[in-house]
Amino acid sequence: MATVPEPTSEMMSYYYSDNENDLFFEADGPRKMKCCFQDLNNSSLEDEGIQLHISHQLHNKSLKHFVSVVVALEKLKKVSLPCSQPLQDDDLKNIFCCIFEEEPIVCEVYDDDAFVCDAPLQSLDCKFRDISQKSLVLYNSCELRALHLNGSSVNQQAVFRMSFVQGDENSNKIPVALCIKEKNLYLSCVMKDGKPTLQLEMLDPRVYPKKKMEKRFVFNKTEIKETLEFESSQFPNWYISTSKAEAMPVFLGNTKGGQDITDFTMELSS
């Protein structure tokens, strides 16, 4: 163990000063003095001019600080430094490695579900029609159908709340959740009889919608000119679709440009 040299009387009176507003180390500070220990016998340190500078301006001074500096200097005595050139930054880095002990950094991984975002969820109230002008209507409180409406029957058109949720990052697609407003019925995609199927699920309004929805409720919205497509996040390449026939259920289809209609127009609802 390295022997700590006895501090001079000048240094001890300095360390036990009553001025608590002094700074401990200040490289270019005023009224600084040098303290050179007589037993630093390493010629490389002396030749390169490594010295301890102590300022009269201290903060949080203690004997522990003094001892730490002396121990560091004792360690420096054991460091072999080349004397052929002035001290470089890399040499100082190696000196630090000898003085200080490296400790591992422990990174803690947190579950995103454990955190709740305080920011309100962005949403829009809207109505949809397919490109053949069929409106989406709630039928028997459990099924969504597409049919042409006119006159007073226009009021039957379902009003959706489209919430912008978390999903796969894609610059061309926006993840959303679709809920029939006032009914808390969410469009979801599940596997039934070996085929992706669109259904309505009633959810607790105190919990839903939320930023991180279950994947079956998420649709990737794509805007093409003035029309929209809604692709299932759970089943890629499957889209919310309507039939060309009248009053048929809205379904999940994987055919674009054929008998299935996958393009919709949106109208904001007040």
UniProtKB/Swiss-Prot annotation:
It comes from Eumetopias jubatus (Steller sea lion). Monomer. In its precursor form, weakly interacts with full-length MEFV; the mature cytokine does not interact at all. Interacts with integrins ITGAV:ITGBV and ITGA5:ITGB1; integrin-binding is required for IL1B signaling. Interacts with cargo receptor TMED10; the interaction is direct and is required for the secretion of IL1B mature form. Interacts with HSP90AB1; the interaction facilitates cargo translocation into the ERGIC. Interacts with HSP90B1; the interaction facilitates cargo translocation into the ERGIC. The record marks K173, K181, K183, K192 as: Important for interaction with integrin. GO terms for biological process: cellular response to lipopolysaccharide; cytokine-mediated signaling pathway; fever generation; immune response; positive regulation of cell division; positive regulation of immature T cell proliferation in thymus; positive regulation of T-helper 1 cell cytokine production; positive regulation of type II interferon production. It comes from the Eukaryota. GO terms for cellular component: cytosol; extracellular space; lysosome. It is found in: Cytoplasm, Cytosol; Secreted; Lysosome; Secreted, Extracellular exosome. Residues 1-118 form a propeptide. The keyword Transmembrane does not apply. Belongs to the IL-1 family. This is Interleukin-1 beta. InterPro entries: IL-1_CS, IL-1_fam, IL-1_propep, IL1/FGF. Pfam families: IL1, IL1_propep. IL1B production occurs in 2 steps, each being controlled by different stimuli. First, inflammatory signals, such as LPS, stimulate the synthesis and promote the accumulation of cytosolic stores of pro-IL1B (priming). Then additional signals are required for inflammasome assembly, leading to CASP1 activation, pro-IL1B processing and eventually secretion of the active cytokine. IL1B processing and secretion are temporarily associated. Potent pro-inflammatory cytokine. Initially discovered as the major endogenous pyrogen, induces prostaglandin synthesis, neutrophil influx and activation, T-cell activation and cytokine production, B-cell activation and antibody production, and fibroblast proliferation and collagen production. Promotes Th17 differentiation of T-cells. Synergizes with IL12/interleukin-12 to induce IFNG synthesis from T-helper 1 (Th1) cells. Plays a role in angiogenesis by inducing VEGF production synergistically with TNF and IL6. Gene3D superfamilies: 2.80.10.50. One of its GO terms (molecular function) is cytokine activity. The keyword Transcription does not apply.
